[in-house]
Amino acid sequence: MKFFASCAKGLEYLLADELLALGASRATATISGVNVEGELRDAQRAVLWSRLASRVLWPLTEFDCPDEDALYAGVAELPWDAHLSVGHTLSVDAHVSGTAITHARYAAQRIKDAVVDTMRRQGLERPSVDVENPDLRLNLSLRKGRATISVDLGGGPLHRRGWRMAQNEAPLKENLAAAVLMRGGWPRAYADGGGLLDPMCGSGTLLIEGALMAADVAPGLQRYGSDVPSRWRGFDRDGWQQLVGEARERDRVGRAALKQVIHGSDMDPHAIRAAKENAQVAGVAEAIWFGVREVGELQTPPQATGVVVCNPPYDERLAADAALYRRLGDTLQRVAPQWRASLLCGNAELAYATGLRAGKKYQLFNGAIECALIVCDPIAVPRRTPLAAPTALSEGAQMVANRLRKNLQKFKKWRAREGIECFRAYDADLPEYSAAIDVYQQADGDRRIFLHVQEYAAPATIPEADVRRRLNELLAAAREVFEVPAERVALKSRERGKGGSKYGRFEQRNEIVHVREHGALLRVNLFDYLDTGLFLDHRPLRGTMAQQCRGRRFLNLFCYTGVASVEAAVAGAASTTSVDLSATYLQWCADNLALNGLAGSKHKLVQADALAWLEAERAHFDVIFCDPPTFSNSARAEDFDIQREHVRLLRAAVARLAPGGVLYFSNNFRRFKLDEEGVAEFAQCEEISPRTIDPDFERHARIHRAWRLTA
């Protein structure tokens, strides 16, 4: 049987892992939740034990729902006397999108009407509605004409643990607090004898959740007490009581063994008083030390290692500023340099303001507030050890080093004039050393240099031993010239096999580096994929478009990681719309926007096949960028071939231009031939390829071609 566990956006993969650990047969992350395969007992166990889920929904029926009449009819077909006892109360939560029914409250009312009418026809008493504490809470998910009616097995939001008696302003939800603790590695740290510290603890949510986690206390125990979460007639009461009995025994053992290694402080005495009250109700007051203390007065904790968790203030009411975050970062480096930190910051800029180097970064949501979670391990990065004395380069490596130095000198004035921090330093300049070397300078921290080396396919006539030797010589030269250690060199090397040469497996480091281009901060991943998230050859075209976008509407088709959208937004675009079929790339685009403080309704992300979307869209734009792939054969859209489809694509894009608007079209297909006669039927077209190539790509100027189109 399949059921659904919802969660805050950003917690999906953590929740999937948690549900698998709790016994689910399969758990697949989706947007704001997890699709789960398991029995009713697995779903009820999730209600009792999940620290991350918002709700656990057990489906009753699913049906096509084009309109309100179909909704009523689909609900009325259910035998409601098998689900709702006489005299029991009812409530319905509804979520609708992409359907003819646009109002969730109206949809909920139609479901209530159908249930009431059905029970009346059966000669049963009319059920009453109780929004706060119903016996049966139903959930409607109506998306794109498909309705799912489910029982909310938990009877309401699972983040309510039952211990919160008092709170300061802007509380943190308990399931998000659990995510901060899990991402920070608190369960393992506690098992290893480490401590837990929150220097801005507020009402104590993170520390209390951490204590309950360490004590192996089921989150649902205090929430439900001796009651059952739902009085749905299908609820397995005997199975629930067995789960509760097992949880109570684990609770008894865990609380008895709970170590006093948790410390919290806050400058607000009212917040500390609330935290103590909450800890008392949760039964962990003896395990947590609370004190009134300003961040800068924080003392070195008694444990040598542990986890610092913190949710510094960040919304408008609390008027947080970068100075507070900087003070927090400085203090943590002073008092707990070898600890790990898991900090839930208001946004990426505030996270950057801490001055801490984040090994991992996550985008989370505290209610409707978008946040940035950074994990630093350790808090104080060890000082860089000097690079080992370089060994003498071979003759071949010395040739590469000389060419690299020559190129750097050639690009020096151009880079200084244009503020170029990421560029191509070498592009098979020496044919026998056939690779590209791209330089990425970190925009934050100590502005480290990273190298991205992409090996080109060698002719089959060259012995494999020579190919490997030359690649090693090229790498040695690059490390010496740029003075970078091997761990900051991302190598995409080719392996020979059946079918010719192909790229081997990449590293899976999940390491994000922030770089800067045209004033915009951008996230790149140099190690995990063939592409980094930033196509350097399009740099001048992005700059041209950004200059033209101030106060104008920008459309980015096949947007990839959204770099052009971000740079347009930073330059003052009135709005940006970014379209791509890939949810992964759209999330990357969203992260790039957030990194620049640009997330919001002005910057729209659309997951769709770009051509189909264009032909259905009616909005107009002032500047459009269209950079399609050469081929695409996604299972979710029609096969795409740029040579075959470009006239149709450009016609649809030009139709979306506002008066005076301009379309920039680019692609990298080396054998591409523009159908000039076909395009001339609807647009004026000028090839601008030479103007879109910067000095670092002049050696291979046909890396892309570009055109400017107007209606």
UniProtKB/Swiss-Prot annotation:
Its main location: cytoplasm. Its EC number is 2.1.1.173, 2.1.1.264. PROSITE patterns: THUMP (PS51165), UPF0020 (PS01261). It catalyses: guanosine(2445) in 23S rRNA + S-adenosyl-L-methionine = N(2)-methylguanosine(2445) in 23S rRNA + S-adenosyl-L-homocysteine + H(+); guanosine(2069) in 23S rRNA + S-adenosyl-L-methionine = N(2)-methylguanosine(2069) in 23S rRNA + S-adenosyl-L-homocysteine + H(+). Residues 42-153 form the THUMP domain. Pfam families: Methyltrans_SAM, RlmL_1st, THUMP, UPF0020. GO terms for cellular component: cytoplasm. CDD domains: AdoMet_MTases (cd02440), THUMP_AdoMetMT (cd11715). Keywords: Cytoplasm, Methyltransferase, RNA-binding, rRNA processing, S-adenosyl-L-methionine, Transferase. InterPro entries: 23SrRNA_methyltr_KL, DNA_methylase_N6_adenine_CS, RlmKL-like_Mtase, RlmKL-like_Mtase_CS, RlmL_1st, SAM-dep_methyl-trfase, SAM-dependent_MTases_sf, THUMP_dom. GO terms for molecular function: 23S rRNA (guanine(2445)-N(2))-methyltransferase activity; RNA binding; rRNA (guanine-N7-)-methyltransferase activity. It is found in: Cytoplasm. SUPFAM superfamilies: S-adenosyl-L-methionine-dependent methyltransferases. It comes from the Bacteria. Coiled coil: none annotated. Specifically methylates the guanine in position 2445 (m2G2445) and the guanine in position 2069 (m7G2069) of 23S rRNA. HAMAP family: 23SrRNA_methyltr_KL. Belongs to the methyltransferase superfamily. RlmKL family. This is Ribosomal RNA large subunit methyltransferase K/L. It comes from Xanthomonas axonopodis pv. citri (strain 306).
